[in-house]
Amino acid sequence: MTELPDNTRWQLWIVAFGFFMQSLDTTIVNTALPSMAKSLGESPLHMHMVVVSYVLTVAVMLPASGWLADKIGVRNIFFAAIVLFTLGSLFCALSGTLNQLVLARVLQGVGGAMMVPVGRLTVMKIVPRAQYMAAMTFVTLPGQIGPLLGPALGGVLVEYASWHWIFLINIPVGIVGAMATFMLMPNYIIETRRFDLPGFLLLAIGMAVLTLALDGSKSMGISPWTLAGLAAGGAAAILLYLFHAKKNSGALFSLRLFRTPTFSLGLLGSFAGRIGSGMLPFMTPVFLQIGLGFSPFHAGLMMIPMVLGSMGMKRIVVQIVNRFGYRRVLVATTLGLALVSLLFMSVALLGWYYLLPLVLLLQGMVNSARFSSMNTLTLKDLPDTLASSGNSLLSMIMQLSMSIGVTIAGMLLGMFGQQHIGIDSSATHHVFMYTWLCMAVIIALPAIIFARVPNDTQQNMVISRRKRSL
């Protein structure tokens, strides 16, 4: 890093800043949801749409971000990403209704979807290959700090100011970041293949409509027949994409990806696995505040051990997988995460609050080992010619499954809690207990998929992707 020119180091700082903004926003909002609900006159049971709208938008827009950067230029797209994210933050702070807030989060999600992948692409273009790993480590470090600061910072802002400030703080830093991007970042443009617009639209419609159908009856009052029509339309869009990809060699995601067994199995497991684990960051701060009566700041502090556990486990997960293999690690961590989530609920309802940080630390460790293993299992055997496409599809599936997870969590809360629940009451405890029991079952189910992973304790066990050919 020290051998790089000053202008390149400044460009890396800009990318790191973008990573920090995006990662901070993924965790800072969850702590503020109960306060948002009170301010907007909504039930806390409906506030999951604030999270779903952002994550689903990121999932939909991810496939287009790399192509746009190549076609229009990395500086132009990164600048646009920061501007859209900042404008979305402003509109979030100005929102007076839940629907306005959801629409503003969609705009924020468009910017967030482009920020991280375009940032990675920028590093690839400005840094010599020999220093790429060091540069990526540098720019992703702020992205790891964001989730650590987010819950506590969100709690402080909500408790001592108002929830609007979790969005307003993005505005000055966004302005500085946009100006620095425009002045300092080069605008690399390369020849690229034609964008698969029909495939992109089919996938986008399918993902959005299916998620809406899953949640529409509770939060939007859509009739069952309309929901059935939406579900059928979403499924039809996905099936049409598969037909399109089979006939079109330039499809957004080639079906040749699924000729690699570990990719197919890993992608299915990642999708199912992240539905369950995607519920936890949303449900935990909501339960601590609504179910147990914690203050926003206290609830935010309680999330820090989970992030620390996740960061610490990343240092040893390679050795664990090398020792036990993917199948054993994935099955054990999947079942372990379900048990730890039940342990968290039990400890909380028994009033043993002093044990909650330890349980959340353990939850973060187990979840991190599971995430790392799922990601590398999915990509490790792909041919080099399909590696980039496979990684993009995995990133999209990760965001989609997390949005579905939050949607299901909100749906479960609504089903058990009907319309309104009080803070720290016996009835509220029962609502969260039933919801958590269902969540534990959903978290555990992907173990059935991971049990089909080949026994790899003697081969293909290192978390790295070797060179492959078609």
UniProtKB/Swiss-Prot annotation:
Q: Which PROSITE patterns match?
A: MFS
Database matches in Pfam families: MFS_1
Give the molecular function GO annotations.
transmembrane transporter activity
Side Periplasmic, residues = 1-11, 70-76, 125-137, 186-196, 246-262, 307-341, 417-430
Q: Which UniProt keywords apply?
A: Cell inner membrane, Cell membrane, Membrane, Transmembrane, Transmembrane helix, Transport
Domain of life assignment: Bacteria
Q: What is the membrane topology listed in the Swiss-Prot or TrEMBL record?
A: Multi-pass membrane protein
Q: Which residues lie on this side of the membrane: Cytoplasmic?
A: 33-48, 98-101, 159-164, 218-224, 284-285, 363-395, 452-470
Cellular component GO terms, alphabetical: plasma membrane
Q: Which HAMAP family match?
A: MFS_MdtD
Q: Which PANTHER family match?
A: BLR6921 PROTEIN, MAJOR FACILITATOR SUPERFAMILY MULTIDRUG TRANSPORTER MFSC
Record family assignment: Belongs to the major facilitator superfamily. TCR/Tet family.
Which protein are we looking at? Answer: Putative multidrug resistance protein MdtD
Q: Which organism is it from?
A: Salmonella typhimurium (strain LT2 / SGSC1412 / ATCC 700720)
